[in-house]
């Protein structure tokens, strides 16, 4: 199995390094990752400037100022030959649950892999300690995919509790929960008296029902949520069409 491995925490982050070491026990792994932390970069792509890469002695490649999406795009289309069989993103330091997937560079890297036609996994740890647990879970899923490919056309967003492996209760297939809107902004002043702003933490859990990713991880289960690239709200199409007809938009300007 040939694996393109990326992340949004940066090429030197413990999550990606732990996962790369574990995956290399049974797979051909090419790391292509940002040279720095790009958390929250979502699906952004660098279009107005060139991208420079640096290759380390072990073969890992850092993309200077690159986003996670840049890294997967370059990895698939230029840097990994032959091309990968699958794209894996992670292990992220911290969860990507509920609305987090909108902002997550970890999920975005997997989405780019799927958009380019490859199966893809996004892997996140609900903490910063037991990366070995998340790596073991990821390897188990990848070995299963080798035996029997999963042809859903979706990415798998995997969130792992920050627990020793023997304390993981199992796996649940879940849906995304949701958070309350975030509203915190943290102002500071620089030495010249100018105001700086920091984006605050995410909102608290809003929808954390028993079938959600939030609930699974809180209860000690690995959460696997199938995600797709299509953002169309199919169930709302008729509602919007009826509304346009009722208000006369499109018949007169």
Swiss-Prot record:
Any one GO molecular function term: exopolyphosphatase activity
Enzyme class: hydrolase
One Pfam family named in its UniProt record: SurE
Secreted keyword on record: no
Binding site for a divalent metal cation: 8-9, 39, 92
GO cellular component, one term: cytoplasm
Keywords for the protein's UniProt record, in alphabetical order: Cytoplasm, Hydrolase, Metal-binding, Nucleotide-binding
Entry-linked InterPro entries: SurE (IPR030048), SurE-like_Pase/nucleotidase (IPR002828), SurE-like_sf (IPR036523)
Entry keyword annotation includes Cytoplasm: yes
Location within or outside the cell: Cytoplasm
Subcellular location, principal: cytoplasm
Co-factor: note: Binds 1 divalent metal cation per subunit.
Task performed by this protein: Nucleotidase with a broad substrate specificity as it can dephosphorylate various ribo- and deoxyribonucleoside 5'-monophosphates and ribonucleoside 3'-monophosphates with highest affinity to 3'-AMP. Also hydrolyzes polyphosphate (exopolyphosphatase activity) with the preference for short-chain-length substrates (P20-25). Might be involved in the regulation of dNTP and NTP pools, and in the turnover of 3'-mononucleotides produced by numerous intracellular RNases (T1, T2, and F) during the degradation of various RNAs.
Name of the protein in its database record: 5'/3'-nucleotidase SurE
């Amino acid at each position: 199995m040939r694996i393109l491995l990326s992340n949004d925490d940066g090429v030197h982050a413990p999550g990606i390094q732990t996962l790369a070491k574990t995956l290399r026990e049974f797979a051909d792994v090419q790391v292509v990752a940002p040279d720095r932390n790009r958390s929250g970069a979502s699906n952004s792509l660098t279009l107005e400037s060139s991208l420079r890469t640096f290759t380390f002695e072990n073969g890992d490649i850092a993309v200077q100022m690159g986003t996670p999406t840049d890294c997967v795009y370059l990895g698939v289309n230029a840097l990994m030959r032959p091309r990968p069989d699958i794209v894996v993103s992670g292990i992220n330091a911290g969860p990507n649950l509920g609305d987090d997937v909108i902002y997550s560079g970890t999920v975005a890297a997997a989405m780019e892999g799927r958009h380019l036609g490859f199966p893809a996994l996004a892997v996140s740890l609900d903490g910063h300690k037991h990366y070995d647990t998340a790596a073991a879970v990821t390897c188990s899923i990848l070995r299963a995919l080798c035996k029997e490919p999963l042809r859903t056309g979706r990415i798998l967003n995997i969130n792992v509790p920050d627990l020793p492996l023997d304390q993981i209760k199992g796996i649940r297939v879940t849906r995304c929960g949701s958070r309350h809107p975030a509203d915190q902004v943290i102002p500071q002043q620089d030495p010249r008296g100018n105001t700086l702003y920091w984006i605050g933490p995410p909102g608290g859990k809003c929808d954390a029902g028993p079938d959600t990713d939030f609930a699974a991880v809180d209860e000690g289960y690995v959460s696997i949520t199938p995600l797709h690239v299509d953002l169309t709200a199919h169930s709302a199409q008729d509602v919007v069409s009826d509304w346009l007809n009722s208000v006369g938009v499109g018949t007169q300007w």
